Amino acid sequence: MARIGLYPGTFDPMTNGHLDIIRRGLKLVDHLIVAIGVNATKTPLLTLEERFQLIEQEAGPIAKELGSKISTASFSGLVVNAADEHGATVILRGLRGAVDFEYETQMVGMNRVMNPHVETVFLAASPDTQFISSTLVRQIAGMDGDISPFVPPHVKAKVLARVAEQKKSR
């Protein structure tokens, strides 16, 4: 039986930290589903389709290199329900520090009550990515800062194009 993992997030935009977790997560499961959470109350910088494309473009070659399977999906609602819907028995989460740990351990407890068949696996962020967040990347890009240390080149191009569009329309 294949081990299926679900790596949830908004990936707006996908960062080098996300890619690090994807690379390491692919070594733990046979099939990793990168699941983009959709929240109707938020307006993302990148469209859902753009995020799918960037994840597939950046993570696809990593999966191929490792001989693993990767796919993308979207979900709204509870992560544990999305895991169940996709047949995942593992939810993969990256931890950047103590604040992430506190929040994520609460979520593990809640998820375990809702579905005891789904386990959560924490991967500590690598030292060179533990400070990266999508929120900070968007803020830096919006202030004309250099985001190249934090995101892959294709992501940088898409983010900068979108930020430029937004500035034109103001």
From Swiss-Prot:
Its main location: cytoplasm. It is found in: Cytoplasm. SUPFAM superfamilies: Nucleotidylyl transferase. Substrate binds at T10, K42, V79, R93. Gene3D superfamilies: HUPs. This is Phosphopantetheine adenylyltransferase. Its EC number is 2.7.7.3. Homohexamer. Its cofactor is Mg(2+). It catalyses: (R)-4'-phosphopantetheine + ATP + H(+) = 3'-dephospho-CoA + diphosphate. One of its GO terms (biological process) is coenzyme A biosynthetic process. Reversibly transfers an adenylyl group from ATP to 4'-phosphopantetheine, yielding dephospho-CoA (dPCoA) and pyrophosphate. Transmembrane segments: none annotated. The record marks H18 as: Transition state stabilizer. It is an enzyme of class 2 (transferase). GO terms for molecular function: ATP binding; pantetheine-phosphate adenylyltransferase activity. GO terms for cellular component: cytoplasm. Coiled coil: none annotated. The lineage of its organism: Bacteria, Pseudomonadati, Pseudomonadota, Alphaproteobacteria, Hyphomicrobiales. Pathway: Cofactor biosynthesis; coenzyme A biosynthesis; CoA from (R)-pantothenate: step 4/5. Pfam families: CTP_transf_like.
